[in-house]
A protein has these predicted regions:
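Metal- and O2-centered redox machinery and metal/ROS homeostasis
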Residues: 1-225
Length: 225
């Protein structure tokens, strides 16, 4: 079996897709729609204020993920460096653009800080759980994240393409390269380790969801300065 064939990443994908609603994805099995974030992105009514908070909180998580794999002495983290999916630098440029347009950039307000701290803890003691978050956070941005970017651009930004939705090279191949790397890292895992990784999926969705909800927050503050 080659790394391009079936691997553990396929199991991760199946578990994560089940946690979507049918409205969000064809494979979705989540039946209860608790709020707007559980609906198709095309039906969202985003706000600039909320979107800026989303970008700020997301950058904290990307900062943490990139720092962990860059600084760690553990050899398996080296496989996750320079994937081409890194977003921290691009988000920084986008936030600078918003600032140049007269928008106040909010400070971190909780979810991103909490998630980054949790990832730092996991990375030192629980590789299977960390890999779950690494996979879900990056892959979500290339799928639903791009739809969010398109919706926000069309409704709020006069169709401006932000840097965090641009990748160097063909995205399909970049994603396949990361799938191969994760399959390589997980190749020697026991079934118990794999199950532990999969069981972390729901928690990764909760952390991401806490950040995602900012996009739909009321436009009460943070307008042009």
């Amino acid at each position: 079996m080659t790394l391009q064939a079936k691997g553990f990443v396929d199991e991760m994908r199946m578990v994560s897709m089940r946690l979507h609603t049918r409205e969000q994805a064809r494979e979705g099995e989540k039946k209860e729609v608790k709020g707007p974030q559980d609906r198709s992105v095309s039906k969202w009514d985003p706000t600039i204020v909320g979107y800026l908070r989303f970008l700020v909180e997301s950058k904290l998580v990307y900062d943490a993920l990139e720092c962990i794999v860059d600084k760690s002495d553990f050899p398996y983290y080296a496989e996750l460096r320079n994937t081409g999916l890194e977003r921290s630098e691009q988000l920084g440029r986008d936030l600078e653009w918003f600032k140049s347009q007269g928008y106040g950039i909010p400070g971190p307000s909780g979810p991103g800080v909490n998630y980054a701290f949790y990832l730092q803890q996991l990375s030192a003691k629980d590789l299977p759980a960390f890999i779950c978050h690494f996979y879900n956070f990056y892959f979500a941005h290339t799928a639903g994240g791009r739809m969010i970017g398109k919706t926000v651009a069309e409704k709020l930004l006069n169709k401006k393409d932000l840097e965090c939705y641009k990748w160097d090279g063909e995205l399909k191949q970049i994603l396949q390269n990361l799938r191969d790397k994760i399959n390589k890292v997980t190749l020697g895992w026991t079934r118990e380790e794999k199950n532990h990784c999969l069981e972390e999926t729901e928690r990764s969705f909760k952390y991401s969801g806490d950040i995602l909800r900012f996009i739909l927050s009321p436009a009460s503050t943070g307008a042009h300065t």
